[in-house]
């Protein structure tokens, strides 16, 4: 299997529709999978609006959507929030992702998270926040494998789930050793 990260495009329409059918009654996560998709061109336009921060609903932030594909098969979806507002900083974080049910257990979630983290670094996000439900132990392990450190746990109002809030610290690329005295 050779996977690559792509931007949403018409080329993957049938695979996207098959992915949605395969999800059945599961929660469609990240949120882009829950958008109306009967008019696929309109869906692509809406994702482009999210990418560019144009005509997005109140409370949302500009968000990049990435698809992990194997050939012409859509196997995973990630969303990268380009910055955090107060609500998303509290519960949501920068990255959300999901893997197609028939492709789970193959390490693709880890791959998708790693390449989405690379995309976050490319746009200048230094400290990356990734949150998951405490009951989703596989996601917690995946976040830790990708450098995440558990910062806190949060219980939201009447919601029964505890949210674990992880942070991937900024890479320490700014450290430059001082030259030794007398060296050129």
Task: Please give the residue ranges for each predicted region.
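Conserved acetyl-CoA-binding loop-helix of GNAT-fold acetyltransferases
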Residues: 96-99, 105-118, 122, 141-145
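GNAT-family acyltransferases
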Residues: 1-94, 119, 160-184
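Conserved beta-strand-loop-alpha-helix junction that forms the acyl-donor binding cleft
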Residues: 130-138
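Conserved GNAT acetyl-CoA-binding A-motif
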Residues: 120-131
């Amino acid at each position: 299997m050779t996977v690559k990260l792509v931007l949403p495009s018409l080329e993957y329409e049938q695979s996207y529709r098959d992915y949605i059918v395969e999800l059945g009654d599961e929660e469609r996560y990240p949120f882009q999978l829950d958008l109306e998709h009967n008019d696929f061109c309109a869906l692509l336009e809406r994702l482009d609006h999210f990418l560019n921060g144009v005509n997005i609903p109140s409370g949302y932030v500009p968000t990049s959507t990435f698809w992990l594909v194997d050939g012409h098969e859509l196997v995973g979806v990630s969303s990268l929030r380009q910055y955090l507002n107060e609500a998303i900083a509290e519960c949501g974080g920068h990255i959300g992702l999901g893997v197609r049910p028939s492709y789970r257990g193959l390490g693709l979630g880890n791959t998708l998270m790693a390449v989405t983290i690379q995309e976050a670094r490319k746009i200048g996000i230094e400290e990356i926040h990734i949150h998951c439900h405490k009951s989703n132990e596989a996601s917690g392990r995946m976040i830790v494998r990708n450098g995440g450190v558990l910062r806190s746990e949060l219980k939201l109002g009447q919601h029964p789930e505890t949210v674990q809030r992880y942070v991937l610290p900024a890479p320490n690329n700014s450290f430059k050793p001082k030259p030794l005295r007398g060296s050129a």
